[in-house]
């Protein structure tokens, strides 16, 4: 029994189109520009500005069989090289240091999440979330 060429080509197309690796394209872990906010107790305004953060997809594997003796961990997109910058919050009360220092991503990598430097929660607040009145820096 021979398979017509058109059926063979259709079969090849369908096999490739449903490949997990090719069914969608996700951006790889890399620095991206993002609007973020900083605020501090004693300062009535939240400062909103753009900076480079790490964002993107990291390949991960999850075992089919999960044993209580096996370690399961996932890699996340996080900072490799950073530079620190400082901004000054407006209208802070006397005695409150108005300066806030934040990391700027220079390069990123897929690695285990470090709670000391990263937000490792499943879903966190948006990066530009503010509890107080927002003030924008327009000259990024």
Swiss-Prot record:
Disulfide bonds join 29-77, 43-92, 46-130, 54-108, 58-110, 113-120. Coiled coil: none annotated. GO terms for cellular component: cytoplasm; extracellular space. SUPFAM superfamilies: Cystine-knot cytokines. It is found in: Secreted. One of its GO terms (molecular function) is protein heterodimerization activity. Keywords: Disulfide bond, Glycoprotein, Hormone, Secreted, Signal. Its main location: secreted. GO terms for biological process: G protein-coupled receptor signaling pathway; positive regulation of androgen secretion; positive regulation of estradiol secretion; positive regulation of gene expression. The keyword Glycoprotein applies. Residues 1-23 form the signal peptide. Glycans are attached at residue 33. Pfam families: Cys_knot. InterPro entries: Cystine-knot_cytokine, Glyco_hormone_CN, Gonadotropin_bsu, Gonadotropin_bsu_CS. Belongs to the glycoprotein hormones subunit beta family. Involved in gametogenesis and steroidogenesis. Heterodimer of an alpha and a beta chain. This is Gonadotropin subunit beta-2. It comes from Ictalurus punctatus.
